[in-house]
């Protein structure tokens, strides 16, 4: 009985770890897409700010995300 409970606890912990790791990978991919789009747009337009309203995330530094409510992302 104890062995069965131990296996169940281990399975739950492994599933939780897999979910957390998957969310972290998705967040990292979104961050890289944002940084790539910001860099490419800044190079082609020659401007300091770029309109990327769909890329608001925790990696953005305020003032851009707070002042422009994710309409503009400033080149830092």
UniProtKB/Swiss-Prot annotation:
One GO cellular component term: extracellular region
GO MF annotation list: ion channel inhibitor activity; toxin activity
Keyword tags: Disulfide bond, Knottin, Neurotoxin, Secreted, Signal, Toxin
A family per Pfam: Conotoxin
Main location group: secreted
Localisation: Secreted
Entry comment describing in which tissues the protein is expressed: Expressed by the venom duct.
Disulfide-bonded cysteines: 49-65, 56-70, 64-74
Range of residues in the leader sequence: 1-18
Cited InterPro entries: Conotoxin
Recorded coiled-coil stretches: none
Residue ranges the record assigns to the propeptide: 19-45
Family recorded in the similarity comment: Belongs to the conotoxin O2 superfamily.
Domain notes: The presence of a 'disulfide through disulfide knot' structurally defines this protein as a knottin. The cysteine framework is VI/VII (C-C-CC-C-C).
Protein name: Conotoxin VnMEKL-0111
Organism per entry: Conus ventricosus
